[in-house]
């Protein structure tokens, strides 16, 4: 939560998102005996994960580190709490790990800037602006960060916010050039 904009943090962005399946997991899924065990484990893990998340939210709320909005699905976190949390993560060498999760979750949730996606984009745009100010260090995170900024720039351009669109698109292009190389952009 400490990386998002301090207001309107959607619950969906905070939950764990399953990683892509490996080839072994895909093969295991085809095995009917494995499937039965996996279904039972998945249901148990999902329930445990939901309970843990709810417990964590209650603890944070009880200590006034966060507040739950009236809709029950979005949160707020004071800037000083965000800053203190990021400092703690840095001291404990976890800052990049959590920044990567933040970028990954936000990139997965942020749609294209097409008109039909504007409501979702509008809700997530402040968080994309926050992400723009928090460039990750790891290359795998930078790819997602550049993609997020591209989608956010697209939305900003569509709604007529040229200044934000230009800034985000330039960050995205520069990052992609650094990762992919200038030849990629020259079409060669």
Residue ranges and their predicted role:
Residues 147, 186-188:
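Residue register of alpha-helical TPR repeats
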Residues 90, 173-174, 182-183:
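Hydrophobic alpha-helical membrane context
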Residues 2, 99-171, 175:
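Extended alpha-helical scaffolding segments used for macromolecular assembly and cargo binding
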Residues 1-91, 96-104:
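C-terminal boundary/linker of central alpha/beta nucleotide-binding cores
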Residues 78, 181-184:
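Short, conserved phosphate/pyrophosphate- and ester-handling motifs at nucleotide-, phospho-/glycolipid
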């Amino acid at each position: 939560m400490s990386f998002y904009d301090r207001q309107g943090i959607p619950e969906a962005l905070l939950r764990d998102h399953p990683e892509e399946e490996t080839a072994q997991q895909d093969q295991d899924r085809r095995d009917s005996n494995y499937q039965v065990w996996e279904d039972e484990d998945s249901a148990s893990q999902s329930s445990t994960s939901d309970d843990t998340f709810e417990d964590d939210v209650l603890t944070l709320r009880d200590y006034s580190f966060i507040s739950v909005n009236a809709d029950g699905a979005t949160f707020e976190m004071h800037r000083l709490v965000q800053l203190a949390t990021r400092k703690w993560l840095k001291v404990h060498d976890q800052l990049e790990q959590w920044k990567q999760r933040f970028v990954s979750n936000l990139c997965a949730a942020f749609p294209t800037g097409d008109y039909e996606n504007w409501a979702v984009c509008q809700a997530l745009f402040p968080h994309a602006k926050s992400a723009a100010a928090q460039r990750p260090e790891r290359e795998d995170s930078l790819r997602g960060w550049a993609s997020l900024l591209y989608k956010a720039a697209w939305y900003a351009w569509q709604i007529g916010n040229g200044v934000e669109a230009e800034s985000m698109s330039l960050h995205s292009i520069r990052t992609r050039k650094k990762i992919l190389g200038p030849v990629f952009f020259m079409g060669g």
